Regions:
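Carboxylate-rich, polar loop motifs that coordinate divalent cations or form catalytic acidic clusters
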Residues: 7-645, 681
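Short, surface-exposed loop/turn motifs with a glycine/proline- and acidic-biased composition
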Residues: 687-718
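Edge beta-strands of extracellular beta-sandwich domains
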Residues: 721-726
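Short, glycine-anchored, charge-dense loop/turn motifs used at functional sites
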Residues: 671-682, 709
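A generic structural motif
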Residues: 148, 686-689, 727
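C-terminal segment of classical bacterial N-terminal signal peptides
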Residues: 1-7
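Glycine-centered coil/turn sites that cap beta-strands in beta-rich domains
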Residues: 641-673, 691-694
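Solvent-exposed serine/threonine-rich low-complexity stretches and specific carbohydrate-binding patches
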Residues: 58, 683-690
Length: 729
């Protein structure tokens, strides 16, 4: 087995990098020069001559994510993308043309496209709304066949076949056929002939030896105008491809070659859990799209296979991004979405590689991975039902809860809801709906200690945050009262914070994240906005306590916004992820908006932000959404006490360049004065940590003239200085 693999590339300042998962490939199409493969949320291309791989994403100007179907224009070069929301892109070497007619159509029905069929100058888009016909010459949608179900009810169309003067359709309720004659109204369901109603059909094709259609694991053939049962396979059929005298048939577990006289298995998954989704013969190789093993290339009759994939996490649905050193970890479960996916992902900023790890113990996979920490270069993972484990990069794991000590499993589950670490090297763990609900674990001697507070709401802890003085902040399940229980196991003091004034004054009792900034303020994200506590050391001192909320544009910052996660960057600026409104970046105090990224003004794949993590050396912000992960490289990086390896780029600056000029390697939070060669001040800039940007404009916001400009950089006290030169052409 050989691998063709492309790893992540370095990202420019203020640039974006996609981090989609390429593990599960759903479909493939063959162009003249490239193969195109679609995952759930993105596309990649394989150069048929060189075998090189490249990404197609919103970063390089696609208009959407979540792919429904792929197709090709008659030229064999222009890729057609039908998205799950009804949007359509036509992608050629020279341009990307968008058609949003279906996307913009107002309906409560799903608009997902499921297949694309090319017929001369007409392109047929089949999907949940029915069939949409796009005419190439008129560059518009010319027909739409909706509500083709019995009695005119909505009916999902999975694939269409054009043969002579007729159109056939594989649908969720049988097979349909209608005449393409100009005098036939195909928008009227009465003009469609129905066969085998009650059966859901996924595919329909025409070969030199007949028509075939697939329903679940059954293959049907059309003879003398009637559809009859032909063959049953051992697993559901996922795709049919006609090769004239042969048919490639893929089921969930095997690929078969069907001729007029035989049915031969040419590839199977050997019970490894891999699901086959699609198959394609490009004349030289057979390509198999799978869940689990990305895109495989087969040579008929040979045992050797090749795997083609790009670097990325194990899943597009990743939670709880956590930074430890230069590594960011993602897990595939969260308290509100437990699943048995037994893997987690690690992104290493030093070598810019993703590593996907499948942990197991005594040969059994570990699922419901809800949290991760790294301590002394060891990885510890929390499985909601199976407990705490120490694991390595190979996935070999050791259970750390024994029957002799520590938490107790009830009904085959520990209900381990979160873990974190303290400055003394202990791991703190919460156990949901348990009388003993908070424990500390000492990895040096594998010992557990019950540290449960007395407050009844602590029983329903979903997350733990440890304050700068060691106080434990326990986020409480909103379904059990919500809010925060703060306690200190040494002083035995505790306090419950909620939305009531004087008792915390939180915007909401639904607490989603708690973070500490560089001023030792504790920021709390809730379903109704953001708040912060300026003195976390005094939380347990008693007295009235109400959280502060920044004021932005004469109102409470992000009031009524569902905040999902908080990130603090090296400039102490605040990043806020939201459930439906993208991601916001505010100044240190929260009073100045710097960026607000949504799907409409950025490559974000979704406005539903699940989590974020900031790597301070590069300034890269990893953002996970419900439709995949993406990174934005901000201009805030961790600073040092002196200038180190100062770089200015681009330099020289071309006349056509309109982006930001980046100056990095500066002393922490340097003050920069930019002058012309005569010493006239052009611009003053302050670095965010060790990085500053200049837009090439002067104090009056006019673009500077061609020439040489000097950058004088100095530390806050003026003792550490540096001079750089920028050439504007």
């Amino acid at each position: 087995m050989c691998f063709q693999h492309v790893k992540a590339q370095n990202t420019p300042v203020l640039g974006w990098r996609s981090n989609f998962s390429y593990t599960d490939v759903k479909s493939i199409v063959k162009g003249n020069s490239s193969l195109y493969a679609a995952t759930e949320n993105t596309i990649f291309a394989i150069d048929r001559a060189e075998g090189s791989l490249s990404k197609l994403t919103k970063i390089n100007d696609l208009n959407d994510v979540s792919v429904g179907a792929l197709g090709l224009m008659p030229d064999g070069e222009t890729l057609i993308i039908g998205y799950q929301n009804g949007n359509i892109d036509f992608v050629s070497d020279s341009e990307i043309k968008n058609l949003s007619t279906v996307k913009d159509f107002e309906t409560t029905q799903s608009k997902q496209f499921r297949s694309i069929t090319n017929n001369s100058r007409d392109i047929y888009f089949a999907g949940d709304l029915g069939v949409v016909v796009y005419n190439i010459d008129r560059d518009e949608i010319t027909e739409a066949y909706q509500n083709l179900g019995q009695e005119g009810k909505p009916l999902s169309i999975n694939q269409v076949l054009i043969y002579n003067d007729s159109i056939f359709a594989a649908t969720a309720d049988g097979l349909l056929a209608a005449s393409l004659a100009s005098n036939i109204n195909r928008q009227d369901f009465n003009n469609w002939e129905r066969s085998l109603p009650g059966l859901a059909f996924s595919n329909i094709i025409q070969t030199n030896f007949g028509f075939f259609a697939a329903s679940d694991s059954d293959l049907f053939k059309r003879e003398n105008g009637n559809w009859i049962f032909y063959q049953n396979l051992s697993s559901p059929i996922t795709h049919l491809e006609s090769l004239g005298n042969e048919v490639l048939v893929s089921s969930e577990t095997q690929v078969l070659n069907l001729t007029e006289s035989s049915l031969e298995s040419i590839y199977n998954t050997e019970g490894d859990g891999t699901r086959i989704n699609h198959v394609l013969n490009d004349g030289s190789f057979i390509w198999v799209a799978t869940d689990g093993l990305s895109l495989q290339r087969l040579i008929k009759g040979a045992s050797e296979t090749g795997i083609y994939t790009l670097d990325g996490p194990t899943s597009d649905l990743s939670y709880n991004a956590e930074l430890f050193g230069s590594k960011i970890y993602l897990n595939t479960s969260t308290f509100s979405d437990l699943n048995e996916e037994n893997s987690f992902s690690l992104y290493n900023h030093e070598d810019r590689n993703w590593l996907n790890i499948k942990p197991s113990t005594t040969g059994e996979p570990i699922g419901q991975i809800i949290d991760l920490v790294q301590l002394n270069d060891e990885i510890y993972l929390a499985s909601y039902d199976q407990g705490l484990f120490k694991t390595n990069l190979a996935g070999n794991s050791e259970a750390l809860i024994s029957s002799n000590s520590g938490p107790v499993s009830i009904n085959s589950s520990y209900n381990l809801s979160s873990i974190t670490t303290d400055e003394e090297g202990l791991i703190w763990a919460s156990f949901y709906d348990r009388e003993s609900n908070v424990f500390s674990f000492d990895p040096s001697n594998n010992s557990w200690e019950n540290q449960s507070p007395s407050h009844p709401f602590a029983r329903y802890t979903t997350d733990i945050f440890i304050g700068p003085n060691g106080d434990k902040w326990l986020s409480v399940d909103p379904n059990e009262g919500g809010g925060i229980v703060v306690y200190n196991e040494t002083s035995n003091r505790e306090r419950y914070l909620n939305l009531n004034g004087g008792q915390g004054g939180l915007p909401s009792n639904v607490v989603t994240d708690i973070e500490l900034d560089q001023d030792f303020f504790v920021w709390v994200a809730t379903s109704q906005g953001i708040a912060f506590f300026t003195n976390p050391y005094g939380i347990l001192e008693g007295g009235s306590l109400t959280a502060s909320v920044p004021i932005f544009e004469n109102r409470l910052l992000l009031r009524n916004e569902y905040i999902t996660d908080i990130g603090i960057d090296p400039a102490n600026r605040k990043w806020f992820g939201t459930k439906s409104n993208g991601i916001w970046l505010f100044s240190e105090t929260g009073e100045e908006l710097i960026y607000h990224f949504t799907i409409n003004n950025s490559p974000l794949p979704s406005n539903n932000i699940l989590s974020l993590a900031i790597e301070p050396v590069s300034g890269e912000v990893l953002i996970t959404t419900d439709k995949g992960a993406i990174s934005f490289r901000s201009d805030a990086t961790i600073g040092t006490d002196e200038h180190q390896n100062v770089k200015v780029y681009p330099n020289p600056v071309a006349p056509s360049y309109t982006g930001q000029i980046v100056i990095e390697g500066l002393v922490n939070n340097a003050q920069l004065k930019i002058t012309d060669v005569s010493g006239k001040l052009v611009k003053e800039v302050r670095a965010n940590g060790s990085t500053a940007i200049w837009n090439g404009r002067d104090l009056n916001n006019a673009r500077v003239k061609s020439g040489v400009y000097l950058v004088f950089s100095a530390s806050q006290d003026g003792l550490e200085t540096y001079v750089a030169k920028i050439v504007i052409i």
